[in-house]
């Protein structure tokens, strides 16, 4: 039996919540029983491999798709019934930006977009355009992938929405552009206090922003927790073990990932550090150190975990 990982954040106030959400395409379920909880003011990173259901989840939150079961709430509203109101308070960066207006200049696109958002802040939009080094006179259809991504981010941020929903926001950005863009996003979050939901499969790129982690695999949300809980409870233990060592029976269900060479083991284990160390020692292992995993390593460990 495997360790039960936390999936209920029990936050007093949630910007995003789903309960038992299911979505089916034909006979195949893209989502099954998803209970997503994003606290107000959090920067929540939802990770998973391609095809895990991340983009489908975001489209449900925006009312672009309807669930086949369960309940969705975004800032207390039902996107199916109040879709326009929800979208007016969300800044959305899609995974694939299909402009539909490729002939428009970036400046004209901003004017077009601003019409739909009463809270649009032109002064802030200009500041972002300058910070992102955007030439607003260029047609958006002729922009590089990285610059097009920055235009999407500007469109999402310029009306200072209470919720940003970003699907692979760093896709197409070179290392320098990525660092600058994430810096601008961090400043935006600090200034506005908005909630951010980021979907990605490249965790290290958004590591410095994240304070919550959700793990999605095969259409299910298998774990979600604050980052401090993750760092406290999931650690990598290095230990020397005697010849013929049979393992630590008391830890059978809590080992998230196993590794090591020869008589040295390197295990990612979920549990209280003192208790895990005690059980390893009682089994004959000599624990050399225990350290928290990076966010990316934790995500990989949780994604590779298999229920038994």
Residue ranges and their predicted role:
Residues 40, 106, 227, 292-295:
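Structural motif detector for alpha-helix initiation sites
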Residues 13-18, 23-217, 221-223:
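ABC transporter nucleotide-binding domains
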């Amino acid at each position: 039996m495997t360790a039960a990982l936390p999936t209920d954040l029990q936050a007093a106030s949630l910007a995003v919540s789903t309960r038992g959400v299911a979505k089916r395409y034909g006979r195949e379920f893209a989502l099954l029983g998803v209970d997503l909880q994003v606290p107000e003011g959090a920067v929540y990173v939802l990770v998973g491999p391609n095809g895990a259901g991340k983009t489908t989840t975001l489209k449900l939150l925006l009312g672009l798709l309807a669930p086949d079961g369960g309940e969705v709430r975004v800032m207390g509203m039902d996107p199916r019934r109040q879709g326009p109101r929800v979208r007016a308070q969300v800044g959305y960066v899609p995974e694939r930006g299909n402009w539909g207006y490729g002939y428009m200049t970036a400046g004209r696109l901003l004017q077009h977009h601003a019409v739909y958002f009463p809270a649009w802040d032109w002064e802030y939009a200009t500041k972002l355009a300058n910070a992102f080094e955007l030439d607003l006179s260029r047609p958006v259809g002729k922009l590089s992938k990285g610059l097009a991504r920055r235009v999407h981010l500007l469109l999402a941020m310029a009306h200072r929405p209470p919720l940003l929903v970003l699907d692979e926001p760093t896709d197409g950005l070179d290392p320098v552009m990525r660092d600058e863009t994430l810096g601008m996003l961090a400043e935006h979050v600090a200034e506005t206090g908005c909630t951010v939901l980021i979907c990605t499969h490249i965790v290290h790129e958004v590591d410095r922003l994240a304070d919550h982690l959700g793990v999605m695999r095969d259409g299910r949300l298998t774990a979600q927790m604050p980052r401090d809980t993750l760092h406290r409870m999931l650690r990598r233990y290095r230990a020397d073990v005697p010849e013929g060592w049979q393992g630590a029976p008391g830890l059978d269900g809590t080992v998230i990932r196993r590794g090591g060479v020869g008589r040295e083991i390197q295990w990612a284990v979920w549990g209280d550090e003192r208790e895990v160390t005690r059980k390893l020692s009682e089994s004959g292992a000599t624990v050399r150190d225990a350290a928290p995993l990076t966010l990316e390593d934790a995500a990989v460990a949780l994604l590779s975990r298999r229920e038994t």
